[in-house]
């Protein structure tokens, strides 16, 4: 399939620059997975589409204040570093701006030496592997020195960094938020539990793939970057029980979806496991894990439009997006949501 088949027209004015005052007041487009029927609701109405015995799966990753501004030690030149993925111990995959002059052996200083980053490997497209040197706990240093890494299409400064975290964010390690989860409030989650709907958590740390567009014409030639994921025994047991009893698994976000489908593909059931996934879901993929999907509206020609198209159909998704544009839904990270069920 050609990447152009996943394009759609989006006025720039519909790209949400700030979150709404109340998380669950976002609009919700409900799409019939098979029928293509469309309903227009508000996000808090999502509970009416969930049934007793269903399990809602949330990604509990936490976004790190991973954008750092510092100096190249040798020259004093200014440099920006976006930490993306922990490779092992204190070695991180990062994006640098400008990257061209940062070579293996060069050191960057942040916060007058509170964090020193040494380049140990050069990657393509501005990527580097950096070894970090610091005292104490890294997260404390990042909270002191770093900024929240908002997506490039958000031009306005975020007044409250917590609005780019889900209310249940726990496991620090992401370079971007799992944005479908931003719509949930603690109160809505309590109401969902009270209805007899299970809530389960997985972790997938959102990394480099989120920032990279598809650069090939034929989507079969696209290579996904790997992201770290983890599922606990408690979550695995709950999901297997949900399937066994004939209830539905509703995935919140494409990150949860990729984790669940990776595990079902590799093990034929849900198991306690951690690892790296580069799963690429596009039309022709057979879903084995999820029965419903809550997600935001994604960038034209992105792998995420392909993922949701594989769950419903390309025609249904592009028709729903066209309707959302017509009715001036808010798009992307701080935008409105879609339930495909």
UniProtKB/Swiss-Prot annotation:
Keywords: Cytoplasm, Queuosine biosynthesis, S-adenosyl-L-methionine, Transferase. InterPro entries: QueA, QueA_dom1, QueA_dom2, QueA_sf. GO terms for biological process: queuosine biosynthetic process; tRNA wobble guanine modification. It catalyses: 7-aminomethyl-7-carbaguanosine(34) in tRNA + S-adenosyl-L-methionine = epoxyqueuosine(34) in tRNA + adenine + L-methionine + 2 H(+). Its EC number is 2.4.99.17. The keyword Coiled coil does not apply. It comes from the Bacteria. Belongs to the QueA family. This is S-adenosylmethionine:tRNA ribosyltransferase-isomerase. The lineage of its organism: Bacteria, Bacillati, Bacillota, Bacilli, Bacillales. The gene is queA.
